[in-house]
């Protein structure tokens, strides 16, 4: 986790800031705000002057600000609006106002919201915008009690050398930014570069025009070029995939590592030569944040091995049966419970034992539900079961995992801290911060390679042997 460059804002600050942004960026919005808004004078700096120790005064203020925000959005976008078509900047400002007007509030007690009575919601929105200054900064949790604001940095690390072979910076929350989701993209070498997202369509158009002008020889040369390594991704000896999860554990969870049998020599050669082949026979290491069925399937499909600490199966009843004590026959599509009773697996991979649980002597160890035990099996349930079984049966897997973990933690500390203090990002948004992360990891790699004897000999970069 990397701290963002802006202050986290409360709901009142966000509402006022979003209205002011609309006034600045939307043509004619200042007049609309003056005509529609009654809760606050948005031309005045600072927060409203109320008794902030009075809960009733605060709730009335929240109601007034939300009502103002909804009125402005309706006036600018509703049917019969006299406003001109909004450009991209103006539309983004109005969309942000609509978002902050709804993400933190709920109708007051006894209200459905139509009477203009609102209150701060007793929950946190899953993908809450925490600042109108940096709209991509997010809340996340490293544990139940350790909450952070900012961004997630994901690293591909080779633990034997400490080299970082790929990296990505994402928002801290959201399923697409989880540890395992980013790791799967790294495995496939398809992590999108935020710096290129705005140019994707233009690049595709230019590519189409170029292809139409090429003759057969040019296309053959292009095909040969495309088969060569590009130098922008995990190298053959050490692709490792980072990931992020909304409820991660510690800093080391941001790195997934991969090694080969002769990883040190191969990594050094690949790094100096600039190769980025994915390579065969890699072993990927990660903690339980990476233990999803989808990631395990991606690693297997890519022809690699996974040494990823699995999350233990949890019983529905304390001390009772876990999922692993139910037998699943994928061929026949059936599930058998610990009491030996069998049910058919539904097309969406759920099963309910229902009436079979009524007179079951093992019921108290299985479920407290009146409708009996039910299961929801993952698409890759077989891989998850095998991982848990292998981890429990083979102590060497845990030893191998623990052997590499300290080196990974050291790499994370080098990226996330400087002078013993955690780094605070200096930019807003994923694009600029991702560029910063790439420069930082490149500098750390260069320092690492120089320490290993990197030198220039006869015009070529070489490593001392």
Model-identified regions with their sequence ranges:
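Anion-binding and metal-coordination hotspots
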Residues: 1-465
